Design a protein with these regions (language model features):
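Alpha-helical scaffold segments
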Residues: 2-264
């Protein structure tokens, strides 16, 4: 009679082979050449995992796992975190950090890939808002943390993440970054204020929303005047525009206006 380990035959059939933690599945099929531990992570119950990791293998054998992907499987299964937190591989340390293990330690890690995993979990945020990498600070903003502090961050991408959380858009109305102002305009903020913005793409958004057309009809940018024409504003003026696309668009609205007048 076949020996029963976990009671899950999909797992036990491998355990009967007296496998090591580094075993790769050699049965042809979906999991061929997958590490057994990755397989266990996908199909094992909490009880299955506990039995295999603690009774069948044991910590001493797990510490000897080889291969980055196999070690990552051990970490994702929740074992040997302290040991692998000291790994020379930033990929392995980052995986430990993903588990929320010792965030204050990893907040000072030399690798930004490790620190960002801490930030993504919203941990050690009081440390990471001062991180030298803007990507890490941005991850903290994306967790809706310390927005009052990060609102004045020198990096526009961080400030953009702060705004994206809905934090006090009025603070960023005249932001020096056109990217930030463009984002606000796209969201429909301060359109009247942006009628005279230096960035054409922002003025174009304003025109598309039908704001400030009396000013934008004279804009030096052809694309913006085209947007004004699309709104059907003053076609009798724009049919004489210097740009052919603007004139053609204005003619459509001019003819429509004339036919409407004739109808009435």
């Amino acid at each position: 009679m076949a020996k029963i380990y976990t009671g899950n035959e999909a797992i036990d059939k491998y355990l009967r082979r007296n496998i090591s933690p580094n075993y790769k599945i050699n049965d042809y099929g979906e999991y061929w050449q997958h590490y057994f531990l990755s397989y266990l992570l996908k199909i094992g119950s909490k009880e299955d995992i506990q039995y295999v990791m603690e009774e069948y293998f044991g910590e001493e054998r797990l510490l000897k796992c080889k291969g980055t992907n196999n070690i990552i499987a051990v970490i994702r299964l929740g074992y040997c975190l302290d040991y692998f937190s000291r790994s020379e591989s930033y990929l392995i340390r980052a995986e430990v950090a993903k588990q929320g293990y010792k965030p204050n330690l990893f907040a000072h890690d030399q690798s930004v890939d490790v620190r960002i995993e801490v930030a993504k979990k919203g941990l050690a945020s009081n440390i990471l808002i001062h991180d030298r990498s803007s990507v890490v600070r941005q991850a903290i903003a994306n967790k809706d943390l310390h927005l009052d502090y990060l609102a004045t961050d020198p990096d526009p991408y961080v400030r953009l993440s702060v705004i994206d959380q809905g934090y006090k858009p009025e603070l960023f109305k005249d932001d020096p970054s056109s990217m930030v102002r463009h984002f606000l305009a796209q969201k429909g903020f301060f359109l009247e204020h942006y009628v005279t913005d230096e960035m054409p793409q922002i003025r174009e958004i304003v025109a598309k929303n039908g704001i400030g057309l009396d000013t934008l009809i004279h804009d030096k940018n052809d694309g913006i005047r085209f947007r004004v024409a699309e709104q059907g504003y003053r076609p009798e003026v724009l049919i004489y525009d210097t740009n052919s696309s603007v004139r053609n668009e204005a003619k459509k609205h001019f003819k429509k206006a004339q036919s409407t007048e004739l109808f009435y």
